[in-house]
Amino acid sequence: MKRLRAVFPGFACLFCLACLPVRAQESQFLPEVDAHLTLNSTFRVFLQAKDDREGGDPHQFAIGPSLQIYVKPLIKLKKVSTFNLDDSKSRFLVLETGYRYITAPNAPWETRLIEAATSNFPLQAGFFLSDRNRVDLDWKNDIFSWRYRNKLSLERTFVIRSYHFIPYVAAEPFYESQYSKWSTTSLYAGSLFPIGKHVQFNAYFEHDNNTGKHPNQQVSSAGLAMNLYFSLQKK
């Protein structure tokens, strides 16, 4: 419980910061499809296609592959993530490198390199904490920029009769090189819904507070991601 007491105040502070008064408000719907293929106990590849407004970006479409590298699974993590189809949740550390091609209406295309490290921690009472540190390296019109983002997620599996679903909350601040400050805070609340052995839906609400440009902008979005999971490993 000590870890939980340390985590919840942080989420509360980030929520208060994100809800400060702003002048402009928008709402969006963000569809996404991710297809994962586990190659062996160490490597997994996936292809992502999504609409997003991450870090205060305009509405845009991103597509591209990633490679993930796992460390060995932990028994405690496997217990709390038993009903989650994402096998990376059972690993203490997951490293990722990826590429995204990004397009937006009336804007030049953009390329992005992604480097990320995610640590997963089992908590008491069946809770699960995930800490993702990610760097985006962007090139647009031959101009380079970068941003750092740190996403903390807290989830727990619940059961209704024989069906298991996984509600979660998350917070992610962004540091943008073009503004030289922490310019965006994103808050998430949603749930994972496993369907069979290969499909898992992620339905969520996202609230963004963007302070990089003037006036500040507040964006609320509803998102729905379909995650597909396949494996070459024999179980």
Where does each model-flagged region fall?
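Sec/Tat signal peptide C-region and signal peptidase I cleavage site
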Residues: 20-24
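Start-of-domain marker
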Residues: 25-90
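Residues that define the transmembrane beta-barrel architecture of outer-membrane proteins
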Residues: 27-29, 59-63, 109-113, 144-150, ...
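Membrane-embedded beta-strands of outer-membrane beta-barrel proteins
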Residues: 33, 63-65, 115-117, 150-154, ...
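Transmembrane beta-strands of outer-membrane beta-barrel pores
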Residues: 41, 49-55, 99-105, 121, ...
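Repeated loop/turn-to-beta-strand initiation elements of outer-membrane beta-barrel proteins
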Residues: 41-47, 74-78, 92-95, 124-129, ...
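Outer-membrane beta-barrel "beta-signal"
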Residues: 69-70, 74, 117, 218-235
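Detector for outer-membrane/organellar transmembrane beta-barrel domains
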Residues: 120, 128-173
